[in-house]
C-alpha cells in the first residue's frame, strides 16, 4: 500500500483519461486521516475545480449546514470524490472514467480505513455498492436506499443524497436532514449496549455480528429495543433489534 503523500502526488499528475484536458485542478481527498466517517461525492464542481478544494461552492455551504445539524465538525471526517476531475458541463461520469479513477478511491479507503463509507448521490453509491457486492436499485428508485445503513465485508455503508439536492426547494428536505443526522450516531455506540443482552449473546457466539454493527454500533435510534428501553417498556431478552424474537436465544 502506498503512502498518502505518494497517492496524492500520483492523483495530481494523472493524465489517464480525457478529463485531464478540461480540468484546472485535480482534487485529492482531504480531512482527518484517522476519520471514522468517509464521505464520497461524485466529482468536483466548478468552484472546487477553480480553487482545488473540496465542497466550497453552493453544495459545500449546504453540506456545512447539514454537518452542523448533525453536530459533526469537518475536522472529524474525510472527504473525497469518485472522480477526481470536474466533469465538463456537469455531465454524467463515463464508465471508463470511473474504472480509471476508482483505483485512487480504493487506495484512499485502504489508507483511511474508515468504519463507515458515506457515498453521496447515485454514482458514488452505485460504485460503492458494486465494490461491496450490494444490490442497488435503478437510478429512479435509488432514493429508497438513502439513509439506510448497510454492513458488509466488515464495513458500514450509509448512502445519502448529495447536498446539491437541497439547492432547490426539495420536498424531501426534512428526510434528507434526518438522514444526515444519522452520521452522528455512527460515532458512538448505543448507551444501552454495555448492559444489552445483544452484547452478551454476540460475545457468546449466539448472535450474528450484523445485529451489533447495524444497530448497537450503528443506527441505534431505529432499534426497537432501544426505543422500548427509553420508554420503560418491557421487552424480552431474546427480542432482536428489529422487534422480532429469536427463540433460540431463550433457551
Descriptions of predicted regions:
Residues 1-184:
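A polyanion-binding, active-site-adjacent surface
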Residues 185-251:
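Cysteine-centered metal-binding/redox modules
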Amino acid at each position: 500500500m502506498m503512502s498518502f503523500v505518494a497517492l496524492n502526488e500520483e492523483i495530481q499528475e494523472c493524465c489517464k483519461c480525457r478529463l485531464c484536458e478540461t480540468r484546472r485542478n485535480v482534487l485529492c481527498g482531504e480531512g482527518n486521516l484517522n476519520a471514522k466517517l468517509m464521505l464520497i461525492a461524485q466529482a468536483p464542481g466548478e468552484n472546487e475545480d477553480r480553487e482545488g478544494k473540496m465542497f466550497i461552492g453552493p453544495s459545500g455551504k449546504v453540506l456545512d449546514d447539514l454537518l452542523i445539524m448533525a453536530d459533526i465538525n469537518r475536522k472529524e471526517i474525510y472527504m473525497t470524490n469518485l472522480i477526481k476531475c470536474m466533469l465538463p458541463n456537469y455531465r454524467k461520469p463515463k464508465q471508463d472514467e470511473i474504472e480509471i479513477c476508482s483505483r485512487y478511491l480504493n487506495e484512499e479507503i485502504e489508507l483511511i480505513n474508515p468504519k463507515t463509507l458515506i457515498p453521496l448521490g447515485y454514482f458514488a453509491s452505485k460504485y460503492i455498492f458494486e465494490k461491496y457486492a450490494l444490490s442497488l436499485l435503478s437510478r429512479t428508485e435509488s432514493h429508497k436506499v438513502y439513509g439506510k445503513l448497510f454492513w458488509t465485508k466488515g464495513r458500514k455503508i450509509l448512502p445519502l443524497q448529495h447536498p446539491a439536492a437541497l439547492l432547490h426547494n426539495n420536498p424531501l428536505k426534512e428526510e434528507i436532514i434526518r438522514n444526515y443526522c444519522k452520521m452522528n450516531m455512527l460515532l458512538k455506540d448505543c448507551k444501552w449496549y454495555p448492559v444489552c443482552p445483544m452484547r452478551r449473546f454476540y460475545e457468546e457466539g449466539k448472535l450474528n455480528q450484523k445485529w451489533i454493527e447495524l444497530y448497537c454500533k450503528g443506527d441505534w435510534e431505529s432499534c426497537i429495543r432501544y426505543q422500548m428501553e427509553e420508554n420503560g417498556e418491557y421487552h424480552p431478552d431474546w427480542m432482536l433489534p428489529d422487534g422480532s424474537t429469536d427463540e433460540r436465544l431463550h433457551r
